[in-house]
Amino acid sequence: MSSLSCGTAVCVVCLEKPKYRCPACRVPYCSLPCFRKHKAPPLQQLPVCPLRLGACCCFIEQCRPAAGPVEKKIRSALTAKTKKPVENEGSLDDDDSVADFLNSDEEEDRVSLQNLKNLGESAALRSLLLNPHLRQLMVDLDQADDKAKLMRACMQEPLFVEFADCCLSIVEPSQNEDP
């Protein structure tokens, strides 16, 4: 898999060379047992997500459980490996080092870390996500075998269209503004 060919990518569980990425949070893992360990809740009590989303699937920072010792070790190692020397501090974009690591399949589809943070902090998006019907649509879409077909069906739902428009207005504000 070309997106994991980067030399700094390691499995979040065992630190081996990864072959896959978690579909929810995009962290690399090498095998099904490692994926199951990654998805399994730790033995200690997890914080309750106010939106009742899974720990891995919740993009709101406050809802995520604390990282385990292996994940902290990986993050610090990746930060050290992907940090570039700063010559012009104003010209270095924090997203560059992360982008090198993630190597998504389509460059144009990549959402910057700042935009992801903006999504997580959006009050309008949070209020939409309180709707149980929308949350069920999201779960169904995540679990669907034919995601493209279900996405077309979801885009016929006014609530889902409102959700998509809200996300796009945050991620691509200049393209959604009226002249």
UniProtKB/Swiss-Prot annotation:
Q: List the keywords (alphabetical).
A: Cytoplasm, Metal-binding, Nucleus, Phosphoprotein, Zinc, Zinc-finger
Q: Which Pfam families match?
A: zf-HIT (PF04438), ZNHIT3_C (PF21373)
List the GO cellular component terms: cytoplasm; nucleus; pre-snoRNP complex
- The entry's Zn(2+) 2-binding residues are C22, C25, H38, C49
Q: Which GO terms describe its biological process?
A: box C/D snoRNP assembly; maturation of LSU-rRNA from tricistronic rRNA transcript (SSU-rRNA, 5.8S rRNA, LSU-rRNA); snoRNA localization
Q: Where are the zinc fingers (HIT-type)?
A: 11-49
- According to its UniProt record, where is this protein located? Cytoplasm; Nucleus
> What SUPFAM superfamilies does the record point to?
HIT/MYND zinc finger-like
Q: Which residues bind Zn(2+) 1?
A: C11, C14, C30, C34
| GO function terms (MF aspect) | zinc ion binding
Which residues are modified to Phosphoserine?
Answer: S104
PROSITE patterns named among the record's database cross-references: ZF_HIT (PS51083)
Quaternary structure (record): Thyroid receptor interacting proteins (TRIPs) specifically interact with the ligand binding domain of the thyroid receptor (TR). Requires the presence of thyroid hormone for its interaction. Interacts with NUFIP1. Interacts (via HIT-type zinc finger) with the RUVBL1/RUVBL2 complex in the presence of ADP.
- Matches recorded under PANTHER family: BOX C_D SNORNA PROTEIN 1-RELATED, ZINC FINGER HIT DOMAIN-CONTAINING PROTEIN 3
Q: What is this protein called?
A: Zinc finger HIT domain-containing protein 3
